[in-house]
UniProtKB/Swiss-Prot annotation:
Cellular component terms per the entry's GO annotation: cytoplasm
Lineage of the organism: Bacteria, Bacillati, Bacillota, Bacilli, Lactobacillales
Gene: groES
Keyword rRNA-binding: no
PROSITE patterns per UniProt: CHAPERONINS_CPN10 (PS00681)
Organism whose genome encodes this protein: Streptococcus oralis
Protein name (database record): Co-chaperonin GroES
Subcellular location: Cytoplasm
Family membership noted in the UniProt record: Belongs to the GroES chaperonin family.
């Protein structure tokens, strides 16, 4: 299993038509974003005074992420992307 560092997040991209809250995203919006599930998160980032700021997302969250963000990786037969938390646009609440 992949364990990301810092503010990085491992995502499993959902390969289906994207909907948010029951609304199908327009074609142009689908080209700019992807829906994904958070698989793992890093520990967060440290502030200048040393405090740890935890990630805003957790494993199991469904998120909307920038389409061209991140690096494609494989772990066994599974394909994932690793992105910085700043590339995650929203948490999708069901």
């Amino acid at each position: 299993m992949l364990k990301p560092l810092g503010d990085r997040v491992v995502l499993k991209i959902e390969e289906k038509e994207q909907t948010v809250g029951g609304f199908v995203l327009a074609g142009s919006a689908q080209e700019k974003t992807k829906t994904a599930q958070v698989v793992a998160t890093g520990q967060g980032v440290r502030t200048l005074n040393g405090d740890l700021v935890a990630p805003s997302v957790k494993p199991g969250d469904r998120v909307l992420v920038e389409a061209h963000a991140g690096i494609d990786v494989k772990d066994g037969d599974e394909k994932y992307i690793i992105v910085g938390e700043a590339n995650i646009l929203a948490i999708i609440e069901e």
